[in-house]
């Protein structure tokens, strides 16, 4: 499908519980439409809404199910899996969904953390519709994500950190050499006006002052920010290259690092190979080995602390 004007689609990527909902809602400050068919709000989880298109969410869930993968699995999605999805009716459904929305709006925003892992599929759809994608990668302290998932899903911290790695690295790899920006959730909560101006300057977007005031004064609510990472980084981020990845992304979120620079890409590739070995069984073994090492370190630290009292 060809269009006379290139449409601008803004896609929020990132791990679950990383502030993707707040970042998606922020797009309205730039008069980016989010549609009106969202999955329902869950009190106590996302009281102010997930801002996820219901149809796109449903399609993503169905595609993962077709691959026998759940959102909380670290099983790698392979190129052959993407090819399989593209050859199924999923592709035509995705085209129809986006064509309908982009036909109505010049600028549209979508969000579903699953997009981070299914992005290669959706990128084929974008190309087929001549849509120009822009990616916002939501960054949140991994400890905060782990604490939030412990409350909501009763996940062990090690599992949550492994998921953070999988989603974050997938978002980084699949958005390479595209129009993208890393946005730190904690910085957005602390100084929303500054972060929104940064986003606007990056894509030459004008701020809607009325929406800006509503978002920064009414929508953002510090009382809903239950979990904040405050421990020294190295004490809870021993799994693989997690500490290094988070540190680089923190710098990218203040424009101190260019993620598309050759040396940075090479480093990210190296980390990606560490957490995403060629074979699924190897990947699981690697994660289990890291998790086991974390557990042993904690056990030793606990015994030493007990001996000092």
Show where each model-derived region lies.
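PAPS-dependent sulfotransferases, especially Golgi type II membrane carbohydrate sulfotransferases
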Residues: 1-5, 172, 201-309
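PAPS-dependent sulfotransferase catalytic core
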Residues: 1-91, 220, 285
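Structured catalytic/translocation cores of nucleotide/phosphate-coupled proteins
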Residues: 6-16, 21-30, 34, 109, ...
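A structural signal for well-ordered alpha-helical scaffolds and beta->alpha junctions
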Residues: 20, 49, 53, 60, ...
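Positions that flank functional sites
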Residues: 42, 141, 190, 214-215
């Amino acid at each position: 499908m060809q269009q006379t004007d290139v449409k601008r689609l803004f896609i929020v990527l990132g791990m679950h519980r990383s502030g993707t909902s707040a970042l998606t809602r922020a797009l309205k400050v730039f008069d980016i439409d989010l549609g009106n068919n969202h999955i329902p709000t869950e009190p106590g989880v996302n009281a102010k809404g997930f801002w996820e298109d219901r149809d796109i969410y449903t399609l993503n869930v169905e595609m993962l199910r077709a691959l026998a993968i759940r959102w909380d699995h670290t099983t790698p999605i392979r190129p052959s899996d993407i090819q399989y999805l593209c050859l199924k009716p999923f592709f035509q459904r995705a085209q129809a969904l986006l064509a309908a929305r982009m036909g109505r709006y010049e600028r549209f925003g979508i969000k579903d953390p699953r997009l981070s892992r299914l992005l290669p599929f959706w990128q084929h759809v974008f190309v087929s519709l001549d849509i120009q994608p822009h990616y916002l990668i939501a960054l949140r302290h991994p400890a905060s994500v782990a604490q939030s998932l412990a409350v909501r899903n009763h996940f062990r911290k090690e599992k949550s950190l492994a998921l953070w790695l999988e989603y974050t690295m997938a978002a980084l790899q699949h958005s390479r050499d595209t129009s993208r920006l890393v946005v730190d959730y904690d910085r957005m909560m602390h100084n929303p006006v500054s972060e929104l101006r940064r986003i606007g300057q990056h894509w030459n977007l004008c701020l809607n002052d009325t929406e800006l005031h509503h978002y920064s004064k009414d929508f953002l609510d510090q009382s809903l920010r239950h979990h904040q990472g405050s421990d020294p980084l190295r004490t809870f981020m021993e799994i693989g290259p997690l500490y290094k990845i988070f540190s680089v992304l923190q710098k990218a979120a203040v424009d101190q690092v260019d993620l598309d620079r050759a040396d940075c890409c090479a480093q990210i590739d190296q980390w990606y190979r560490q957490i995403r070995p060629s074979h699924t069984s190897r990947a699981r073994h690697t994660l289990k080995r890291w998790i086991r090492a974390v557990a042993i370190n904690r056990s030793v630290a606990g015994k030493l602390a007990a001996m000092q009292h």
